Amino acid sequence: MFTSAHANRSAQASASAGHYAHRSGEQTANGLISEIVYREDQPMMTQLLLLPLLQQLGQQSRWQLWLTPQQKLSREWVQSAGLPLSKVMQISQLSPCHTVDSMIRALRTGNYSVVICWLTEELTAEEHERLVNAAQEGCAMGFIMRPVRNQGTLGRQLSGLKIHSNLYH
């Protein structure tokens, strides 16, 4: 998983998710927009990172909105992931050109604790600013999921952190 340029430019994006968790159980302290760039061949890594936060947000009275490109969330997956089926809403088959505007409108309402969408292209600076303002206005979190394909290493390792574990060797 990688972080995008927009995620690194905002002090809010670098704050821990716990800072934004509910104190009273009703409203987050502030809005947050985060772009999560992940490898399509390793979707479990993203789930391991996001599910605990989504489960915690599921304890709020507000909805969770998933703006998905084509696939529909399965009820079985939502339940097995520990998310409240009664608070998860999904809009699928959404055109990519309408996704950011739909996310802005949803965040602004304050009806959602979190809005998650999938985009294939990076956000512009103006789109990012509009999303941050909408998230702050609605005291909500927004996650932009952006998959990248594994391009292969072409004989050399990509730079990054490598953690060795005796549990797997």
UniProtKB/Swiss-Prot annotation:
Gene name in the database record: sulA
Q: Which InterPro entries match?
A: Cell_div_suppressor_SulA, P-loop_NTPase, SulA_CellDiv_inhibitor, SulA_enterobact
Composition bias of kind Polar residues appears in: 1-15
User: By its UniProt entry, which PANTHER family does this protein fall under?
Assistant: BLR3025 PROTEIN-RELATED, CELL DIVISION INHIBITOR SULA
**Site positions for Essential for degradation by Lon protease:** H169
Indicate what this protein is called per its UniProt record: Cell division inhibitor SulA
Q: Induced by what?
A: By DNA damage, as part of the SOS response.
- A Pfam family (short name) is SulA
Q: Which HAMAP family match?
A: SulA
How is this protein organized at the quaternary level? Interacts with FtsZ.
**Membrane spanning residue stretches:** none
Q: Where is this region: Disordered?
A: 1-22
- NAD as a keyword? no
